[in-house]
Amino acid sequence: MAEITTIARPYAKAAFDFALEQKAVESWAEMLNFAALVSENETMQPLLSGSVASGKLAELFIGVCGEQINEQAQNLLKVMAENGRLVVLPAVAQQFVEMQREYAKEVEAQIVSATELTSEQLQALSVSLEKRLARKVKLNCSIDTSLIAGVIITAGDLVIDGSVRGKISRLSDSLQS
């Protein structure tokens, strides 16, 4: 996984810098997400494994994407195809979106709770996280009844485990040591 991230980073950075310069970050995010979906298609997967010449692969890939991508994005896809890197397009798109959020001072927080949270609880979490992270926070909520009670919050590198399951686990670890 780290290798894919390392390979994808320069492509995502180049695309983001260019999109920022052109004031077209949103459209580039859409184009990269579309191209990533195409690359993940089960029909396309065998072609990305290297059985097709890079020039033909780029031509085919761009043809499939059609008018969904502009000329500059086509150039990026050609370079990636020449280097045998079209397979990392989903990681490029993901890193591009992360760069976009970082630039906009936004962060996506995953909230996993034992029960559904009320709108007041979500608002309080959002305000608290925005204050702590000094960024605008977008909450993605899910329910995991195995937590017993409480929440686990993940936002970037920050992980806060306030679940009963986590407390029991930490208590067990301290008793065993």
Curated annotation (Swiss-Prot):
Keywords: ATP synthesis, Cell inner membrane, Cell membrane, CF(1), Hydrogen ion transport, Ion transport, Membrane, Transport. F(1)F(0) ATP synthase produces ATP from ADP in the presence of a proton or sodium gradient. F-type ATPases consist of two structural domains, F(1) containing the extramembraneous catalytic core and F(0) containing the membrane proton channel, linked together by a central stalk and a peripheral stalk. During catalysis, ATP synthesis in the catalytic domain of F(1) is coupled via a rotary mechanism of the central stalk subunits to proton translocation. This protein is part of the stalk that links CF(0) to CF(1). It either transmits conformational changes from CF(0) to CF(1) or is implicated in proton conduction. This is ATP synthase subunit delta. NCBIfam families: ATP_synt_delta, PRK05758.2-2, PRK05758.2-5. Belongs to the ATPase delta chain family. It is a peripheral membrane protein. The gene is atpH. It comes from Shewanella pealeana (strain ATCC 700345 / ANG-SQ1). It comes from the Bacteria. One of its GO terms (cellular component) is plasma membrane. Pfam families: OSCP. F-type ATPases have 2 components, F(1) - the catalytic core - and F(0) - the membrane proton channel. F(1) has five subunits: alpha(3), beta(3), gamma(1), delta(1), epsilon(1). F(0) has three main subunits: a(1), b(2) and c(10-14). The alpha and beta chains form an alternating ring which encloses part of the gamma chain. F(1) is attached to F(0) by a central stalk formed by the gamma and epsilon chains, while a peripheral stalk is formed by the delta and b chains. It is found in: Cell inner membrane. SUPFAM superfamilies: N-terminal domain of the delta subunit of the F1F0-ATP synthase. One of its GO terms (molecular function) is proton-transporting ATP synthase activity, rotational mechanism.
